[in-house]
Amino acid sequence: MSAGGASVPPPPNPAVSFPPPRVTLPAGPDILRTYSGAFVCLEILFGGLVWILVASSNVPLPLLQGWVMFVSVTAFFFSLLFLGMFLSGMVAQIDANWNFLDFAYHFTVFVFYFGAFLLEAAATSLHDLHCNTTITGQPLLSDNQYNINVAASIFAFMTTACYGCSLGLALRRWRP
């Protein structure tokens, strides 16, 4: 009892006062039945191929292709984490605006992947450039490295397009 004789009500439990998470995508395996889930799976597949192809070319131009490797590896793991959170149903337990987080993630990765695609295409276009380190003037990229970089450029474009489609879908969910 307080000095005035009236009892003070207990403070509200903070666990009950949080609003529910805002997410319109389904949690669990149902995420794979949506366009967004399919695009995330394609992002992981194509992004992994970009990572593997650039690494298998022995990264002849580390200044350009180092960024491509960083973006593809980082986006690959964050997309796996993103998909894993939806598959496990953790999005229903974490209070966040998942629609905004989905949009912000795909916007950021789209911008970075677009830059990585441009750098990979630029590295591939240097195939006919000759090195001045030898008297014979060997090309900067061997024919094998050139072919691998062409494939990496194509898959980087496809991955960028998938992130762009996911960005459009996320924008529709975030701002209906």
From Swiss-Prot:
Cytoplasmic side: 1-34, 88-102, 171-176
Membrane topology recorded in Swiss-Prot or TrEMBL: Multi-pass membrane protein
Gene Ontology terms: biological process: myelination
Location(s) in or outside the cell: Cell membrane; Apical cell membrane; Endomembrane system; Cytoplasm, Perinuclear region
Tissue: Predominantly expressed in kidney, lung, and liver. Also found in thyroid gland, stomach and, at lower levels in testis and small intestine.
Domain of life the protein comes from: Eukaryota
Transmembrane segments: 35-55, 67-87, 103-123, 150-170
Positions annotated with a glycan in the UniProt record: 132
CC per GO annotation: apical plasma membrane; endomembrane system; extracellular exosome; membrane; membrane raft; perinuclear region of cytoplasm
Lumenal face residues: 56-66, 124-149
Keyword Transmembrane in record: yes
Keyword Membrane annotated: yes
GO molecular function list: structural constituent of myelin sheath
Keyword field: Cell membrane, Cytoplasm, Glycoprotein, Membrane, Transmembrane, Transmembrane helix
InterPro entries: MAL (IPR013295), Marvel (IPR008253), MARVEL-CKLF_proteins (IPR050578)
Segments forming domain MARVEL: 31-175
Quaternary structure note: Interacts with TPD52L2.
Family the UniProt entry places it in: Belongs to the MAL family.
Name listed for the protein in its UniProt record: Protein MAL2
GN (gene name): MAL2
